[in-house]
A protein has these predicted regions:
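Membrane-embedded transmembrane alpha-helical bundles that form the catalytic cores
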Residues: 2-446, 452-497
């Protein structure tokens, strides 16, 4: 028998926050806790009030394990925007509504600005006025702050625009903002799509939802633990840490490797988030749709991080005027939107470069389509051979444009970003050798891009024929096998830092 002290020692880590070990979907601890949580959740199908607060409690616990005391910030934002949303709906004056939505935007952006950009502006001030002008601040960045603040902003803005009615209960709004599957890295869920699902009675999980959820959790775990983490630890990290040690071909392979790593990491998280939500009876929007199939930058942003792309379009690009104010203004709006999208990821010159280049890419594609309309107003129908050659060339150009810009996203500083690009385009430098064991992981990742939809359909079809209990056992066995296949230890998801 364990002594009381031994039991306490085993339980304490579950109740304490460790900044070096945030709770991750891909950890054995989370999967075990979720299984226990889901078991009791099943008994609350017909009790909405109890179910809502049960989920809120687990969500806040999950966030506490990720960001500690900053769960109070999450709760504070929910209180603030809940009451501002209700005030916007009930005041009669449009001027008062405008002031209230401005207050919400200013408060949320001030919170985001403090945590993400304080040291960025201090660095600028030190460059202008000298190193002794200001000291850098040791500011902890709460996990997922950009995601839940964007969700909260969309809520008050939609009420102001008249496209959404405010919720009557604060608990419902806290549920929406804190729901653990999407809390720390999206998808960015719109209030109008999610709030109507909260008080389902009874909560409905169809066989199709259950099978799809299990597939998405399994494939997301595989993408993260087996492909992304393996490529990162065994190849990509080594080259990006010190590119001067590697040849141009090895640096090019690392560029391709990181393009695959970030896709498998982020889409793997999104798959798991959507799958977990489905098992609980909630539907999230798709967040990735084979983005590396894209033949233009515009198409890429319709397929990559779809919830963020749609948010930037609806609340920033359209608010700036969209394409309604002339060609030059359209290009300007695209550039501003992508620059701010880049800075949303982080306060660093690398993200600024990344955003500027994507904005330029979108503007160039838009200008190309305008020219095509001018020269071929009735349309242009090339021969099949010419069509496929053009599509292939466009895909190749788009893929490399996106992949090389990921270098700025991944490298620790501009110096290493430029060193990798220099070595890629100046061949002949000696290197340490390409690790052949990485190749299978790369090939599997590419296969998921090409055949993911077919695999999904086949898996769900097979799963739906099995009893629910068998499906749960399959998930547990496959999940355990995947975790054993992956590297030792669990690496944080890349988008946790945003």
């Amino acid at each position: 028998m364990e002594s009381l002290r031994e039991i306490i020692d085993r339980v304490l880590p579950l109740l304490s926050y460790d900044p070096q070990a945030p709770m991750l979907f891909s950890s054995e601890l989370f999967l075990f806790l979720f299984a226990a949580f889901a078991f009791f959740y099943g008994f609350m199908r017909r009790t909405p009030a109890l179910r809502i607060w049960y989920v809120i409690a687990f969500s806040l616990y999950f966030y506490y394990k990720s960001s500690g005391i900053y769960l109070l910030l999450l709760v504070g934002v929910s209180v603030s925007d809940f009451w501002i949303g209700r005030a916007i709906a009930h005041v009669g004056s449009r001027r008062a509504q405008r002031a209230l939505v401005a207050l919400s935007i200013a408060a949320d952006l001030a919170v985001l600005g403090y945590f993400k950009y304080t040291n960025f502006f201090i660095e600028i001030a030190r460059d202008l006025f000298g190193a002794g002008f200001l000291e850098f601040q040791n500011i902890f960045l709460p996990v997922g702050i950009s995601f839940f603040l964007f969700q909260s902003l969309s809520y008050t803005i939609d009420i102001y625009r008249g496209s959404l009615k405010p919720v009557d209960r604060w608990g419902d709004y806290l549920f929406y903002l804190s729901f653990f599957p999407q809390l720390v890295a999206g998808p960015i869920v719109r209030a109008r799509d999610f709030l109507v699902q909260i008080r389902q009675n009874p909560i409905a999980v169809s066989r199709e939802m259950f099978g799809t959820g299990i597939y998405l959790i399994t494939i997301g775990l595989f993408k993260k633990a087996v492909i992304s983490d393996y490529i990162s630890l065994n190849f990509v990290d080594r080259i990006f840490d010190d590119p001067a040690l590697y040849s141009g071909m090895e640096c090019l392979a690392a560029v391709y490797g990181y393009a695959l790593q970030i896709y498998c990491d982020f889409s793997g998280y999104s798959d798991m988030a959507i799958g977990l939500a489905l098992l609980l009876g909630f539907r999230f929007p798709k967040n990735f749709d084979a983005p590396y199939h894209s033949a233009t930058i515009t198409e890429f942003w319709r397929r990559w991080h779809i919830s963020l792309s749609m948010w930037l379009r609806d609340y920033l690009y359209i608010s700036l005027g969209g394409n309604r104010k002339g060609r030059l203004r359209t290009y300007f709006n695209l550039l501003v939107t992508m620059v701010l999208g880049g800075l949303w990821h982080g306060s660093n010159i690398r993200f600024l470069v990344w955003g500027v280049m994507h904005g330029v890419g979108l503007a160039v594609v838009h200008a190309f389509h305008e020219l095509k309309k001018r020269f071929w107003p009735d349309g242009f129908t090339p021969s099949p051979a010419l069509h496929w050659c053009g599509v292939g060339a466009a895909w190749l150009l788009t893929f490399h444009f996106v992949s090389f810009l990921w270098v700025f996203f991944r490298a620790e500083d501009m110096e290493r970003s430029l060193e990798i690009l220099r070595r890629v385009f100046v061949f002949g430098q000696p290197g340490e050798g390409f690790p052949l064991l990485v190749i299978p992981a790369v090939l599997i990742g590419l296969a998921l891009q090409l055949f993911g939809a077919r695999l999904f359909a086949a898996f769900v079809d097979a799963q739906e024929r099995l009893p629910w209990a068998v499906q749960a056992v399959v998930l547990a066995l496959v999940g355990g096998f995947i975790l054993k296949m992956g590297p030792d230890g669990v690496m944080p998801f890349i988008y946790f830092q945003f």
